[in-house]
Amino acid sequence: DNDGLPDDWEIENGRDPFKADYMVSSGNYNTCALDDTGAVCWGSQGDAETSIPSSLNNPFQISTGGGNTCALDDTGLTCWESDGGNQSLVSSTSPSSLINPLQVSLGLGHACVLDDSGIQCWGHQGDGRSTVPDSLINPTQVSSGDYHACALDDTGVVCWGYDGEGQTSVPDSLSNATQVSSGRLHTCALDDSGVVCWGSDSYGQTTVPSTLSNPTQVSSGGYHTCALDDTGVV
């Protein structure tokens, strides 16, 4: 569930290893976090960023992106605008046919959800970012970038949407990928060799430092990338 807590510890302490206990998600206008009390959001443009729907009930996953925030809770999926309406396609058209949603990931004006039926995406359709490939086989993770999205399935990493910087062109060298993270114009994955990144390198965001030691998690931002390794360095 990528919350940084060992799965065996979570099981021993009565927590669900498939649901994140603590997490932080930063979008263009706001940041949201989950803690023991629920969801907390803050931002730079007043109530639009910090207001959380009162209907949320035990949220276990949250994602911010563009001008929207979405959360998964005991009742399913809830999305709301956080920039005054510039990206309303996500909050106004979220699907109602989800089956046990497990993960939500927001991009720039689009969103994707992983549920028991596979992956559903909606919102802006530019460059095919919301068109999920029929070829996906048993997907286990989805990550939305600004203009593209990627998923992890039985075949490895699959990406779709805008490929102007090569961010959806998955390297053939990837081996047994365990995580994928989509940024603005680049993508990174965690595999047997460590962290592998592709796409735009305009600010060095795909140049992986040689000092990484046994990385366990990677996160792609707009023009940067961060990783967690066994030294605790990000």
Range-by-range predicted roles:
Residues 1, 223-234:
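Low-complexity/repetitive intrinsically disordered segments
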Residues 1, 8-23, 53, 95, ...:
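Proline-centered structural pivot motif
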Residues 22-31:
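Beta-strand-rich domains and repeat architectures in extracellular enzymes and scaffolds
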Residues 30-33, 41, 68-71, 79, ...:
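Conserved core positions of repeat-based scaffolds
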Residues 50-52, 90-94, 128-132, 166-170, ...:
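A short beta-strand motif characteristic of beta-propeller blades
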Residues 30, 58, 68, 99-100, ...:
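Asparagine/serine/threonine-enriched low-complexity, disordered tracts
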